[in-house]
Design a protein with these regions (language model features):
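Fe(II)/2-oxoglutarate oxygenase catalytic core
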Residues: 1-143, 147-182, 188-212
Length: 212
């Protein structure tokens, strides 16, 4: 058997690189992380869910604290469930499992599981500035976002705006949600927001968590 054989199409070395970069800078961006056909498949499944009423208004907070609050975010989501995942979703989940192990080997974060959702931002939708850790809990340690939008341009809006210094609102980095782009960052270190999208915007967003 070949050592280091890629199980899911992304060489183990690339995953180790992502983990290293995450350890060094807290933020990693990888374009063309997955082949265009797989991205298109994931996107078309998202559009089918939209058409069949399979998406719900996203909320903020957990459990009792959950609120659908469209002043803060106006995207629509479906949580991923490994039991009912499509083959394309399962492929991506498999890759994330390898990434989780690679990050644990490098950062010793004790990442335990992944939770994530497909997200669709209709034209005009946004997500105001926030941290991916709910008040009083730090279970989400690493955020991983995969964008599903081919040919996204500046004029389409919908940028992910990251603030590397929580105390300095004037310093930020904008990223377009280009299909195949993977963005991975330490959840507690980067406040961020999604600027209003002028086109429908699709992504799979998730978090590696530690045990409750
Ligand atoms: C989120 C989020 C960013 C994006 O869902 O928590 O911040 O670019 N998403 O989709
Ligand atoms: Mn977020």
């Amino acid at each position: 058997m070949m050592l280091n054989a890629p199980l899911t199409g992304v060489p183990a070395n690339d995953l180790a690189d992502i983990a290293l970069k995450l350890a060094e800078t807290g933020l990693v961006i990888r374009d063309d992380f997955l082949p265009a056909e797989l991205i298109e498949q994931l996107a078309s499944e998202g559009r089918a869910l939209r058409d069949n009423g399979g998406l719900r208004a996203a909320g903020i907070g957990r459990g009792q604290q959950f609120q659908a609050n469209s002043a803060i975010r106006s995207d629509h989501i479906q949580w991923l469930d490994p039991e009912t995942a499509t083959p394309a979703q399962r492929h991506y989940l498999g890759l994330l499992e390898e990434l989780r192990l690679a990050i644990n080997r490098t950062l010793f974060l004790g990442l335990f599981e992944f939770e994530g959702h497909l997200a669709l931002y209709p034209p005009g939708a946004y997500y105001r500035r926030h941290l991916d850790q709910f008040q009083g809990t730090q279970h989400r340690l690493v955020t991983v976002i995969l964008y599903l939008n081919p040919e996204w341009r500046e004029a389409d809006g919908g940028q992910l705006r990251l603030y590397p210094d929580p105390a300095d609102d004037g310093r930020f980095q904008d990223l377009l949600p280009i299909g195949g782009r993977l963005v991975c960052f330490l959840s507690g270190d980067f406040p961020h927001e999604v600027l209003p999208a002028r086109r429908e915007r699709l992504s799979i967003t998730g978090w590696f968590r530690k045990r409750d």
